Amino acid sequence: MTETVVVLGAGYAGAGAIKSLENHLDGDADIVWVADHEYHLVLHESHRVIRNPDVRGSVRLGVDEIKSPGTRFIRGSVTGLDTAEREISLDDGSTVSYDYALVALGSRTAYYGIPGLDEHSLTLKSLDDALSIHERVKEAAREGTPEDPATIVVGGAGLSGIQTAGEIAEFRDSRRAPVEIHLLEALEEIFPGNDPELQGALRKRLVERGIEISTANPITEADDGAIYFDSGDPLEYDVFVWTGGITGRDCLTDSDLENDHNRVNADANFRTSNDRVFAIGDSAIIDLGDTPAPPTAQAAWQAAEVAGKNLARETRGQVLDTWTYENKGTLISVGEAAVAHGIPGVPIGTFGGPAAKLLKKGVAARWIADMTSIGRAARAWPDM
């Protein structure tokens, strides 16, 4: 009897695993793909939609563009996973049976119990989120004046927060909109935990774009018009975007899989506490010893290739590969500019300019080409 492998999620981890699984299984098992949407979002470029909604067509890849005809796709939100029955529950009440499952559900925004943060902030986790930010910023800019500009606040100065602030600055400048932008970070410096040279390069470009940066002052509360801090005066705002962290999806709460804050624990071969369930991406915490993988697109891409191979090997009773994360550097955009750091083979540690911008565009285009086609990537190139 043919076995069934079910992949949950259409983010970088899920979509990448589908491509890898199709390649390595070679028709030896049935593949079922379950996801909330009938598309994969190129999330690390979704901030472009904030400035220009027309970009959505470039960052939205339909599942039929990605999967082979033999892979069955089911649109639905996962509500539970029963390892005893080997069943996945969906929001419409249906279930999907599996012999092996890969959890690649991504993450949701973490609010850390800060009062009012969930209720009064926008997030950037989906295409609809990016479109909502665009509309809210446009509306606020329309109501602002040079004497009383609209205040746009981005909370969290990690990758997503920096890129979001940069894109809002491009929106402002391209439309000469009366907007001031604030980027907030609770820790001592923007892009926390990274190389000081990279942090300095990013800060320089943000300041050049007229973005006001505040660090080392955590948010303690938010209401419908102001943000409150550990010290100092409240900051009144018109639009508040929160990008300050991630946590696991609630649908895994009742699962018996070992997890930490709903992120499933997995070994370096991606097997979880249940032999028939594997996990990768933001929904997983992979045990890599002293070098944990970051919750980034780069890590998800790498893991997806090995996870697909391992699931195919598991169905054949073969020994599984162990994944080792390879840091291939960091690429971040600040509007039309970009900063690159730690790129293998490049003697300069941190650099910007056309070379950094070209590298960032190239990475996005390569992912789109790998998922769909070179032609699709070429059409998306101007929007990256």
Enumerate the language-model features and the residues they cover.
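FAD-site-proximal beta/loop scaffold in flavoenzymes
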Residues: 119-148, 225-226, 234-302, 309, ...
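A Rossmann-like FAD-binding core segment of flavoenzymes
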Residues: 72-80, 173-265
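C-terminal, flexible cofactor-proximal segment of oxidoreductases
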Residues: 25, 303-384
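Beta1-alpha1 glycine-rich phosphate/pyrophosphate-binding loop at the start
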Residues: 1-72, 163-194
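FAD-binding core/adjacent interface of flavoenzyme oxidoreductases
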Residues: 71-150, 241
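Rossmann-like NAD(P)H-binding beta-loop-alpha module
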Residues: 133-181
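Nucleotide donor/acceptor-binding cores
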Residues: 3, 29, 86, 100, ...
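Short hydrophobic core segments
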Residues: 6-8, 96-108, 235-246, 304
